Amino acid sequence: ACNLAEASWGGGETATMKQIVIPGTSELAGSAIGIITSKNNLVISKNLKSNDRIILLKSNGVNANGISLTRAVAKKLPKGYATKLSDGIMYGDALLTKTNIYAKLIQDLLEANINIHYLSNITGHGLRKIMRAKEDFTYMIEKIVEPQEVFNFIQKHAGLSDEEMYGTYNMGMDYAIFLSEKDVKKAQEIITKNGFESLNAGYIKKGERQVVIEPKKVVFKSDTLNLR
């Protein structure tokens, strides 16, 4: 991951890893420190504008969030992680798909003079994460990708609603890029060249800070996202 992102491992944090770290052993977690060499490359939320498009990047799977629940599901299954999904992949293997690293993609977009207004990863708070910016915008999601089968499997065996799933997991979309309509086509071409799939999924507008996922009739208010 460090090589792909061209980043150094310069520190870490003490993470809570229940049921993962064996007593008497250590767990390592990393952080990254970077230098922005040009203010033109500084991507901050004040650049967001009404009618900006939301480009969602397709994930490879669950990534590293919501894992406690995936383990709880495995414990209830007679074959555990060896249980096969409807697509023929074993549950355990589906949970181990690699997480996409988008550092080079973002660099390529900037070098192509794509004016990126904001970026947001979609992790442990699901699609709620895209309203991380403090400005008052409503995030309208008009289209979503079909989630990988592992998400349907988790939802079925955990008995979760669409709201709970989209508020916890990436549901097949793990990164959001916000930009002007005029930059969408060129940006998606660069995304494809980098080997990733994208969806011109929606737009933002001035209004109450919330995420509206129209295909699922799910709305997340700002008070459901508590981040430091």
Put a short name on every predicted segment:
Residues 1-68, 203, 214-216:
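Glycine-rich anion-binding loops of enzyme active sites
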Residues 34-37, 52-54, 58-64, 71-74, ...:
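Glycine-rich beta-alpha junction loops
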Residues 40, 44, 79-81, 141:
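Phosphate-handling active-site elements
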Residues 62-107:
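Glycine-rich, acidic
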